[in-house]
Amino acid sequence: MHDDIVYPGPEGTHTAAAASLLHEGARLVPLAGFRAVADAVAAADAGGGVLPIESSLAGAVAETHDLLYERSLSIVAETVLPIRHMLAGPERIALDSIRVVRSHPMAFDQCRDLLAQLPGAARIAVSSTAEAARLAAEDDDASVVAIVGEDAASLYGLTVLADDVGDHTAFTRFVSIGRHTRLDVDEAAARTAFSFVTKHQPGALHAAIEPFARAGLDLQRLVSRPLPATPWKYRFDAVVAGHPLDPVVRGALRDVRALTRELRVVGVYEGHEEEQ
C-alpha cells in the first residue's frame, strides 16, 4: 500500500474522480474519512492522498485545512472539478411519491430548490453522495432516493429521476497531499501555500499580509482557522501566486515571518489552469 493513493471513500465520490485525474494510472484506495487519509500519508503508509479543500459555493473545507497543519503535510498538486448533482433511485418514481432523500449535507445545501419541491420528504444526511447512492441501491423501497453524482449513480446502477438539480453551477478544488514539499514546479504556474499565526495585537493581520501587496504579489486565498489550545486566537492558511524560490516571493515570505509568531510553507504546486 506504500505507493497507493488514498482518498476518503467509498468509490464513486467526486474525490475519487479527482484522484484518478491527479494520479492517472495509480492504484486508488478508499479509506474511512479525511482523518484516515491524512494519517496514512503522514505515516508513509500511502504514497499520497487526495482531499477536497474548497467549494465554490460553501468555501473552505475546514477539516482538510486543519489536517494538513496538524499532520505537517504538504500540497503537491491541485485540480478543480465541476460538481453536478442528480436525484436518483432504484427505479423510476414520481417526485411527489418520494418519502426520503439521502445525501451529504453539502449536497443538501446546494440543492435547496429541488428540496423545496419535496416538502413531504425526510432528509437523511450520510457521509458522502456515493454512500447515499449505495444505500439507495440496496433499499427495496423506491420512495427512498438520493442526491448523488453521475459516477455514483452509474456505479450503483441507479435510475436518474432528475438531472443537474443543483441551485447554481458548483466547482470543488481538490488537492493531492504528501509528506514533503516539492520545489520542482514550473515557476510561471507555481502557487505557494503557507500557514502563519499572527501576534495577538491590533493590526497584526493587516501587517502580516501587507508585504505581498507591497511586492505586487497576488494573495489568492486566505482562510482563518481557530487554534484549539488558545481560545480566540487563529491560524491563517494562505496561497500566493509564485514560487518560494523566486526572489520577490522569498522576500515577501521573509518579511511575513518577521511579523508573525509562526510561518511555514505547506505546499508548492502548479495552480489550476483557469487561475493562471
List PLM regions with ranges:
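Domain-level signature for soluble enzymes in the chorismate/prephenate branch of the shikimate pathway
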Residues: 1-276
